[in-house]
């Protein structure tokens, strides 16, 4: 097996930059777009879905859709992992998934913000639910095999550490670019209006992310670095066996709390900046960069 060079590590990490940017768009701006505050509405933001606690008197539409999407994601994760483990493609077990998931992931991210009815409508809510499910399925189909490649491409502890360090950087960079969105759509507002400018911004970002996600597909020959042996175990059989490991259960618990905290931070930051501090949307980027540097 070949050793992964520094250049190849960065080519692999380009994929992380791409999906992190798309993930950042959804995490940072989904709720902000569909549950706008008074400031955003006064600036021309259209209200596309019913507001308030309209789902059983407990959830907002956007909250219910987001929660259902996360539950859907929890079920598809082991299924995609199993399909990838058992893949018999000549190009390896992981790269084919990265190849075919890239375009659906980029498209679904854009379409999440492309409501078919240009006013408050339940049709938009149904469309949003479908697009959110498509997004979560696509990002799972890309990220699960992608993350599985990390220990497979690194043959030693140092190599795996190098890969993890670089992709950590590109993850932060991709998320930071997603936070630049207000600065970019501010330039488009005079020509397209607020909603059109936001959609144009996310479309451009998704196009860049799509290209980045394809970099490891065309630059890394998986079988040159990984001795791929398709697995035969079922998805839920492997999952049950894995959860028998007490240390793994501890890791999963800590990972859950990590993602809950990160999601709360990413979703709430735009509202904190605009609603509480009464600052321009563009300040969101500075707050993210500043807090990331301090952390």
What does each of the following model-derived ranges do?
Residues 1-295:
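Membrane-embedded alpha-helical bundles of multi-pass transporters/translocases
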């Amino acid at each position: 097996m070949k050793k992964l060079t520094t250049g190849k590590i960065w080519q692999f990490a380009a994929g992380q930059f791409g999906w992190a940017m798309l993930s950042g768009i959804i995490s940072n701006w989904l709720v902000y777009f569909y549950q706008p505050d008074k400031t955003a509405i006064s600036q021309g933001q259209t209200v596309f879905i019913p507001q308030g606690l309209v789902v059983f008197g407990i959830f907002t539409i956007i909250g219910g859709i987001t929660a259902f999407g996360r539950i859907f994601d929890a079920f598809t994760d082991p299924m995609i992992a199993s399909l990838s483990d058992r893949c018999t493609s000549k190009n390896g077990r992981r790269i084919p998934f990265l190849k075919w998931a890239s375009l659906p992931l980029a498209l679904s991210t854009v379409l999440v913000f492309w409501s078919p009815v240009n006013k408050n409508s339940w049709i938009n809510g149904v469309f949003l639910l479908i697009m959110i499910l498509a997004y979560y399925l696509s990002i799972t189909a890309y990220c699960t095999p992608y993350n599985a490649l990390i220990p497979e491409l690194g043959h030693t502890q140092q190599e795996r550490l190098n890969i993890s360090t670089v992709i950590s950087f590109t993850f932060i960079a991709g998320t930071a670019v997603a936070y630049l969105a207000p600065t970019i759509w501010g330039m488009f507002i005079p020509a397209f209006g607020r909603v059109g400018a936001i959609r144009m911004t996310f479309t451009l970002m998704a196009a860049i992310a799509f290209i980045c996600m394809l970099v490891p597909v065309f630059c890394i020959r998986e079988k040159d670095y990984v001795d791929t042996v398709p697995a035969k175990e079922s998805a839920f059989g492997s999952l049950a066996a894995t959860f028998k490991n007490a240390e793994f259960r501890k890791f999963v618990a800590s990972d859950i709390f990590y993602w809950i905290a990160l999601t709360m931070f990413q979703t709430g930051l735009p509202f904190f900046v605009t609603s509480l501090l009464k600052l321009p949307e563009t300040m969101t980027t500075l707050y993210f960069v500043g807090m990331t540097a301090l952390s």
